[in-house]
């Protein structure tokens, strides 16, 4: 996995690309301007920055420039989760879950899903 970190705005732009790529600049403006208020020039600058980070590729087809993600959503999500976990909880998954459970942020379905995840993780660890 790569080490590309995304800002909140870059996440919005990348989500649009992950769902719709390849896209022209005009298509991205249409997808993002109502929710963000971003102008064409703002989105263009963000695309250039994401390209220089290695997150977006720019392909020219005639006069059109098409933008596509170079990183997978799953990889970016893992990187963001690791960063958040380290920054906020000192890397402790247990502390994070305890905090969420203490705030009653977990539904019964969440708890059942966590049990299944932990059971599966326990099985994988015992196989090693």
Positions of predicted regions on the chain:
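Pre-recognition alpha-helix immediately N-terminal to the DNA-recognition helix
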Residues: 11-15, 27, 95
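Short acidic, hydrophobic short linear motifs in intrinsically disordered regions
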Residues: 23-31
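Short, hydrophobic-biased segments on the C-terminal half of alpha helices
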Residues: 47-48
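Glycine-centered, phosphate/nucleic-acid-interacting loop/turn motifs that mediate DNA/RNA or nucleotide
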Residues: 54
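Short helix-coil junctions and helix-kink-helix linkers
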Residues: 30-38
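C-terminal regulatory/oligomerization modules of transcriptional regulators
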Residues: 79, 102-128
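Short, cationic-aromatic polyanion-contact patches
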Residues: 3-9, 61-80
């Amino acid at each position: 996995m790569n080490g590309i970190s995304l800002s909140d705005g870059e996440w919005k732009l990348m989500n649009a690309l992950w769902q719709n790529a390849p896209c022209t600049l005009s298509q991205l403006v249409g997808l993002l301007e109502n929710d963000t208020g971003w102008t064409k020039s703002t989105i263009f600058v963000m695309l250039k920055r994401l390209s220089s980070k290695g997150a977006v590729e720019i392909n020219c087809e005639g006069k059109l420039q098409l933008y596509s993600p170079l990183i997978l959503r799953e990889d970016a999500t893992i990187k963001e989760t690791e960063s958040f976990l380290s920054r906020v909880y000192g890397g402790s998954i247990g502390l994070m879950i305890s905090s969420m459970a203490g705030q009653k942020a977990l539904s019964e379905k969440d708890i059942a899903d966590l049990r299944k995840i932990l059971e599966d993780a326990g099985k994988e660890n015992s196989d090693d």
